[in-house]
A protein has these predicted regions:
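Nucleotide/pyrophosphate-binding catalytic subdomain
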Residues: 1-217
Length: 217
């Protein structure tokens, strides 16, 4: 919404941006201990400034390119994950935040980039092999191309990120938490008669993934 407002030369994007900023500040106030708020507020403020620079550019030229769009929408994941990371550190002292763009590498198909699995797996493996913290928090949905430009993985990109990371570090299990309890015979939001599937084979799951089933990658 905000980027489209800016590209249409609608100055209301500034109001929307301020609302976004205040919403994140309120989240910090409610979620993070007071002693840890100042540094985080500075971090989030700096991120918002970078976002504003991109939006100002869209406003000036009256255009929103796919590359700029990816850069803009990435802030949603970046802002929220950094807030969650600080809140998590209050419970797990050695938990850290890691920018997924440093590990997930893609082509330059902005909006729905394709992962370079060989390079990505190598980067993930090297990182986690030298990783000593008990918990690492990475934002989903975002990656970067060979030039360092921010890319996004398209619809379902956050779940896909989890699957890529699990594969790269050879995890023994991957849990994806959603607002639906397990897999259903249909989308329960659309089909009231949908029923949960008690068990499913890997082959059946693979077939479903080919037909666009969410969560499966």
């Amino acid at each position: 919404k905000t980027s489209n407002e800016a590209a249409l030369k609608n100055e209301s994007y500034l109001t929307t941006l301020e609302e976004i900023k205040q919403k994140h500040f309120e989240t910090i106030t409610n979620l993070v201990a007071k002693k840890n708020q100042n540094d985080l507020l500075v971090t989030i403020t700096n991120e918002i400034k970078q976002l504003k620079t991109l939006l100002d550019g869209c406003f000036l030229i009256g255009e929103l390119s796919p590359r700029t769009s990816d850069a803009i929408v990435s802030f949603g994941e970046l802002l929220s994950s950094q807030i969650i990371a600080v809140a998590l550190q209050e419970k797990v002292s050695d938990a850290i935040f890691k920018d997924s763009r440093e590990l997930l590498k893609t082509n330059s198909n902005f909006g729905k980039a394709t992962i370079n699995l060989k390079l990505t797996n190598s980067l993930i493996s090297n990182y986690f092999n030298s990783f000593k913290q008990s918990v690492v928090l990475l934002p989903g949905f975002i990656a970067s191309d060979e030039k360092g430009n921010t890319t996004t993985l398209g619809r379902g990109g956050s779940d896909f990120t989890a699957a890529i990371l699990a594969n790269g570090c050879k995890a023994t299990s991957l849990e994806i938490w959603t607002d639906v309890s397990g897999m259903f015979t249909a989308n329960p939001k659309l089909v009231k008669q949908a029923k949960p599937i008690e068990s499913i084979s890997y082959h059946e799951a693979m077939e479903l993934s080919h037909f666009g089933a969410k969560v499966l990658y």
